[in-house]
Amino acid sequence: MPTNDLHARLAATILTQLETADPASWTPPWHGADPMPRNARTGRRYRGINVLTLWCAAQAQGYADARWATYRQWAALGAQVRRVERATLVLFYKELPRGTDADPTDGAPFVARAAHVFNAAQVDAPPPPADAPAPSVASDPLPAFDAFAASTGAAIQHGGNRACYVPATDTIHLPPRSAFRTPTGYAGTLAHELVHWTGAPHRLARDLTRRFGARAYAAEELVAELGAAFVLADRGIARAPHPDHAAYCASWAPLLRADPRALSTAATQASRAADYLTTMQEAAECRLPPRAGAHRVTASIETAKSRTATPDYITANRYQRLS
């Protein structure tokens, strides 16, 4: 299958769900407790569009195992793919050989290739999971997640009734913890805003206006939604849709109709954001010198109750209940 077809198929799957499902009860493939899919042979986790593709397949088929591999990889592990099973396509990028006259300062040339992978539930005699199993969904993920958020150095202020990242002040604003129904609701909202935070010019410099024009806001929100899902899945935290998610996702349908590759682009940017946040956590765990702008949490603030949504005020409205 051409790689363009894979992008289009994934977009069509999500678009069909958006247009035919009950918006109030629709569960996107990136919501739930599924861990990040990993390759059974190498142990490496999949990235970008492949995560969404494999989550979609797992949701449709009811796969609970996060391990995937090609036919040959399963065979090398002593497992046999059953004849009746159908593969799921993923993309990988292969480096091409350089010409003798190539400029060594240029980036290495890559070409996209498709691979057929099967879930562990589709094979006979799969090996047992690795010694380090996927993290279980924590009943109270806040202590570990708070440490993760602190490691980013983001300025986080609590108070008011809005969840947003403000580029002008480079701060994240959240409602009080007591306003959220569950700890995972709080963690999901904070993860969403942290992904927005990574897009600042002095971080990942994520500017989607050239790529999406007037739909850049919807694309950025999709990046934050997917990035939050990746961050939480890596930490074994269940992702649950908030009550307003149907209205919140309404802008995605026009985006996907106009550009079938928008979902893939957003997934790639979301992976970069999640990796950026994880790298900051790893650096903090290595006890590197603290960066300027250490993490600050204010218990109560006078937030901008009179502010309206402007280009400098990116609002997610990800809270689950506000009192």
What are these regions (language model features)?
Residues 1-323:
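N-terminal accessory/interface modules of nucleic-acid-binding and processing proteins
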